[in-house]
Each structure stands twice: as structure tokens, then as C-alpha cells.
Regions:
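Conserved acidic donor-binding segment of nucleotide-sugar-dependent glycosyltransferases
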Residues: 309-310, 314-321, 330-336
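A conserved mid-protein helix/loop that constitutes part of the nucleotide-sugar donor-binding site
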Residues: 19-30, 193, 197-219, 228, ...
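Aromatic "clamp/platform" in nucleotide-sugar-dependent glycosyltransferases that forms part
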Residues: 258, 277
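A conserved, positively charged/aromatic
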Residues: 74, 113-142, 159
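Short His-centered aromatic/hydrophobic patch
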Residues: 93-101, 117
Length: 373
């Protein structure tokens, strides 16, 4: 095996779309390469193609797999062949499907296996998934959760002591954006309040709750010109557009689809909103913290581990439009509060949630995994 700085790490992703875990994988891969690791991305070859294209744009050579059914022996054997050819030292699987497949491949290749879970939706109410994940984790060199809240859930599901699951919070490399183009594109004046949310359009992200809060907020004439812009795509788009039309919000709700210019969106925003029903440690929240935005977020999952209410953000119960509307109103009417919370959030992000801090943690995990192999 290679020395620690020259290890070959296979990063396995079950999804190839533009979402938080996939963006995290790109930053993890880039930073590992900067530190002397060889990185082998392993990603779906029959999806939308965003993630393999992004890896290629960064001069990686991704390996593609095609999974035609939940248990696909041809896919499994293909992964074994590919990773044997690439001579990887450690398999690092992200989320449920690749945790299970990665466990099988690692067992055949006799390589250490690291599992990172980014959320808990995979095993809720599905006993077969719980059994499969428990088996995969039982054979892993390390199991990682991105928050202490998820660690507790996993420990219960996997019947492991919490200490057996390491917590490594996500970290990012921040980027600075420019606000002018976004507001001009959306037809929003500099004096009109803009609330930005970032996340694909699925029920778990709570975007309907945000629109319900906007409707309540605009009943106050002081906030009648308020706009909401949501970056993301997904199955709820039709329902969100229908709600906006039904309640005369169409001119104030902007569904933007996938956006590569998240730093610009945040620069244009007065407030960042995270109305999710469930989260690990969302990258969008970290991006908003680095941007120094006034933040209101649901107090779910790992969010309270990242921001403290009234110190770096205003936290509210999930699925509670009146509470969310109240928090948004407080931030909109109090520029000093936005500035204070935003500055505190940025300082905390710089201390605790950088990509370097995250990669330091994974380097330690890899070293321990290789030492046990």
C-alpha cells in the first residue's frame, strides 16, 4: 500500500445530480488531490450526467457504473473489476446504496471501507434497508455521520454505540458573489427585500412552508414587496407554481431551477431561508454563513449544531409557517440584527466549517482504516 499522502481513494456516489452531497464530493476530491492523494470518483453513468461532467471539468477521470435494479450483480462485478484496475487503497462510500455496494466490493477486494451518511431518509420505515445498512456498517473500517443528530439515529438503527460512529461536519471552500446581475435578471429592485432558498424541490426541503410564510408575511404592508427566489429543481415545482398562482404570489416567487451561481444569489439576498423538514448539515446553510447573510432555518437534524438561535441565526420549528413568517419579518425589519447574526455566522463558519477542517478529519479516518487493514 502507498504511504498516507499517496493513498488512492475511491469516492463512490449513488447520485449524479447537482445537490449538496455531490457538491461536497467535488470539494473533497479536489482537496484530497491537493494533499497528494490519488482520487478515483465512481459515479452513475445513466443519470443526468452533471457529476461526471463536473469531475471531468476538474481534470478527474470518473469511473461510471449503471445500476438497472436494486440488486444488480452485473453492476457489482463491474465495480469490482474497475476498482481492482484502478488499484484503490480505500473505498469511501456516500449514502445508503453505495454503502451497501461498497461493502461488497471492499470485501471482495480486501480493501478498507469507509461509509459517510449524509441523511437519514434512507432507512426510515424500511426494515430491509436497515438490515442492509447494519451489515455494511458492521464490516466497515469506519462509519461517519455528518452531524451528531444523525449519529444518534444511526446508532439506534445500526445497534451500535454512538462512539462507534464518528461525527465529521461538512465543510466548504467559500466563494464570493456579485449581487447586481441576479436582481436585474429577476426584475427585483435594490430596495425590494429578497429571501433566497437553495435546495432541490422535494417535500423534505419544505419550500411550500416558505411560500405559506411569504403569503402571511405579505399581509403586512411593510413587506408587500418581498420576493422569494428558490434555486433547485424537482418534483414539487408544479405544486409550488400552483400555490403561488392560487394566492397571487406569482410575481413574487421565482423558481430558478438549477443554478451554478449560488454565490451571486446569496450576494443578492437580504435573507437566506432553510425551511427543511429534515437535514444533515446542509451545504447551502454553510454557503449562507460564509456569505454573512441573515439566516432563518428549521431547527432540524444537524442545523442546531451549526448555528445557535439568536447568535448566528433565527431557528424555528419545522412545518410552522407562522413561526417562519415571524422570523423573516424580524430579519427584514431589523438591519442591525441581520448584520449581527450574519457576522457571527461568518466567523463561526471560518472557525469550524472549512473544507480543510473536514478533509483533516477524513485523512485521519483513512489513516486509521489503512492501519486496520
Amino acid at each position: 500500500m502507498n504511504q498516507q499522502s499517496g493513498l488512492s481513494i475511491a469516492l463512490l456516489s449513488e447520485s449524479d445530480g447537482p445537490a449538496g452531497a455531490e457538491k461536497l464530493l467535488l470539494q473533497l476530491a479536489e482537496t484530497l488531490r491537493e494533499r497528494g492523494y490519488a482520487v478515483c470518483p465512481v459515479v452513475p453513468g445513466n443519470g443526468c450526467g452533471w457529476l461526471p461532467a463536473e469531475f471531468r471539468r476538474r481534470a478527474f477521470t470518473p469511473e461510471l457504473f449503471v445500476m438497472r435494479r436494486p440488486v444488480d450483480w452485473r453492476c457489482l462485478l463491474g465495480l469490482v473489476h474497475t476498482l481492482r484496475r484502478r488499484r484503490v487503497d480505500v473505498l469511501h462510500s456516500h449514502d445508503f446504496t453505495m454503502a451497501v455496494y461498497g461493502a461488497a466490493v471492499a470485501g471482495i477486494l480486501r480493501r478498507p471501507h469507509v461509509i459517510t451518511m449524509h441523511g437519514g431518509r434512507y432507512f426510515a420505515g424500511r426494515w430491509s434497508r436497515r438490515v442492509a445498512l447494519r451489515a455494511a456498517a458492521g464490516h466497515a473500517a469506519a462509519a461517519v455521520a455528518v452531524s451528531a443528530a444523525l449519529q444518534a439515529d444511526l446508532a439506534t438503527v445500526l445497534r451500535l454505540p454512538r462512539a462507534a460512529i464518528r461525527v465529521l461536519h461538512n465543510g466548504i471552500r467559500p466563494a464570493v458573489g456579485s449581487p447586481n446581475g441576479v436582481r436585474r435578471e429577476l426584475g427585483i429592485g435594490a430596495e425590494e427585500p429578497l429571501i433566497v432558498a437553495i435546495g432541490n424541490l422535494y417535500p423534505v426541503k419544505g419550500h411550500l412552508v416558505l411560500l405559506q410564510a411569504l403569503r402571511a408575511l405579505r399581509e403586512d404592508p411593510a413587506f408587500a414587496r418581498c420576493h422569494v427566489a428558490i434555486a433547485g429543481r424537482g418534483e414539487e415545482e408544479t405544486a409550488l407554481r400552483a400555490y403561488a398562482a392560487e394566492h397571487a404570489l406569482t410575481q413574487h416567487v421565482h423558481l430558478l431551477g438549477y443554478r451554478a451561481d449560488v454565490p451571486d444569489l446569496l450576494a443578492a439576498a437580504d435573507i437566506f431561508a432553510l425551511p427543511s423538514r429534515s437535514e444533515g448539515v446542509p451545504l447551502a446553510l454553510l454557503e449562507a454563513m460564509f456569505a454573512g447573510k441573515g439566516i432563518t432555518a428549521s431547527a432540524v437534524g444537524g442545523v442546531p449544531e451549526v448555528v445557535t438561535s439568536e447568535r448566528e441565526a433565527l431557528l424555528v420549528p419545522s412545518e410552522d409557517p407562522p413561526s417562519l413568517a415571524t422570523a423573516l419579518g424580524r430579519l427584514l425589519e431589523d438591519a442591525a440584527l441581520r448584520l449581527r447574526l450574519g457576522d457571527a455566522a461568518r466567523r463561526r463558519a471560518e472557525r469550524e466549517f472549512t473544507v480543510d477542517t473536514m478533509v483533516d478529519g477524513y485523512m485521519s479516518v483513512y489513516a486509521n482504516a489503512v492501519g486496520r487493514a
